[in-house]
Regions:
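Membrane-proximal cytoplasmic juxtamembrane segment of single-pass receptors
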Residues: 1-135, 140-167, 214-221, 226-227, ...
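Pre-DFG segment of protein kinase catalytic domains
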Residues: 201-204
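Conserved catalytic-loop aspartate of Hanks-type protein kinases
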Residues: 247
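Activation segment
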Residues: 207-209
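Intrinsically disordered, low-complexity cytosolic regulatory tails
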Residues: 4-7, 26-41, 89, 272, ...
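Protein kinase catalytic-loop region centered on the HRD/HxD motif
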Residues: 169-182
Length: 377
């Protein structure tokens, strides 16, 4: 009887497991079908503006059966490919997750409808059920990140300055010049790509949002971006509305990393005062010692014109990361400041608030900035 009872329990458990798996599979299939219908409706609405659509078998042919992997990120894997007419492309195969749907539509809705010399071009896309992919122009030199965080000054100051100015022009176009304003929300060295001639192009619009020209702010439900580049108002709504000035903050952090040729938060810094580069750079500017100290760190000669470029990049970067978003310049103004035309950039005020109390909103922001930036969490 005991054996019979055990057998009955086992059979019942197995039957329940089978039923659960069937229901789970059915639920997943329903979700996939729902997602597929949503994306297809979106593509139908944008069809008159869309780049070329490719089938999955065509993607396999373009990438030689996904033979040449270029890299892997949070949203998928990127492969090198070649179109029939000979153009080299980067093919991003998106992960099958709830985030890939929104990233796919974000990229198509933004890059699929705009064109600018300093924005990476979306050349095509693929969507078949749960499989989606995006095809971009191929950027031979990869991301800016691998050139500014390495030992030895691979890029000269003039080249770095040109890259900074080009990236600024691309972002300014998003904010002020295209038909529908776009906030990128993830400006950082990894998302500035360089072609064979080191022309910079802003990439990765997976977190981007369209922003109506009549609106004075944008609504978001969660913090967007990468720790270390995220503006204070994105951490806490008490610090002001989210606007295009959030991108300005991120660009400022990027610009400072280019000027310092190091990460803004560097746990390997020889002195604690140099741990956070923006604060150290601000103090050096106040003392008039910026160029001298950066010369000591660099491996290439720095002439007077180079010194001017570094000084300008640093000052503009510090203006961009002002704690109060109203004190930050627009990206169009940033372009003007970088172009210079002989005019010096005025010294920025202290970008950071005075040392906050441990429980204040400001303290929470700085704790997140440092802890998340250092740990990558």
């Amino acid at each position: 009887a005991a054996i019979g009872g055990s057998t009955l329990i086992l059979i019942t458990t197995l039957l329940l497991a089978v039923v659960y798996r069937k229901r789970s599979s059915s639920s997943k299939l329903h979700l996939m079908n729902s997602t597929s219908s949503k994306v297809e409706k979106f593509l139908e609405d944008y069809t008159h503006q869309m780049p070329t659509r490719y089938s999955y078998p065509e993607l396999k042919k373009i990438t030689n059966n996904f033979a040449d992997k270029l890299g892997e990120g949070g949203f998928g894997v990127v492969y090198k490919g070649k179109l029939a007419r000979g153009n080299l492309v980067a093919v991003k195969i998106l992960d099958q997750s709830r985030h890939s749907e929104s990233q796919f539509m974000n990229e198509v809705a933004t890059l699929g409808t705009i064109h600018h010399f300093h924005l990476v071009r979306l050349l095509g896309y693929s969507f078949e059920g749960f499989r989606s992919a995006l095809l971009y122009e191929y950027m031979a030199n990869g991301s800016l990140e691998k050139f500014i965080f390495v030992e030895g000054d691979v890029l000269g100051w003039e080249q770095l300055y040109s890259i900074a100015l080009g990236a600024a022009r691309g972002i300014a176009y998003l904010h002020d010049e295209c038909n529908r304003r776009i906030i990128h929300f993830d400006i950082k060295p990894h998302n500035i790509l360089l072609d064979a001639d080191f022309t910079p192009k802003v990439a990765d619009f997976g977190l981007a949002k369209l922003w109506g020209k009549g609106s004075d702010h944008i609504s978001i439900t969660a913090t967007r971006g990468t720790p270390g580049y995220v503006a204070p108002e994105l951490w806490s709504r008490n610090l002001g509305p989210v606007t295009d000035k959030s991108d300005v903050y991120s660009f400022g952090m990027l610009l400072l990393e280019m000027a310092g040729r190091r990460r803004n938060i560097d746990v390997r810094a020889s002195r604690s005062s140099q741990l956070y580069f923006p604060e150290w750079a601000f103090k050096l500017i106040e003392k008039g010692e910026l160029e001298t100290r950066l010369k000591e760190r660099g491996s290439t000669e720095m002439g007077s014109e180079d010194e001017e470029k570094v000084r300008r990049m640093t000052k503009v970067g510090l203006w961009c990361i002002q704690y109060n978003s109203n004190d930050r310049p627009s990206m169009s103004r940033v372009v003007q400041m970088l172009e210079g035309n002989g005019d010096d950039v005025t010294n920025p005020p202290m970008p950071f608030n005075s040392t906050p109390s441990p429980g204040s909103t400001i303290a929470i922001f700085y704790r997140r900035l440092f802890v998340d930036g250092l740990t990558g969490s």
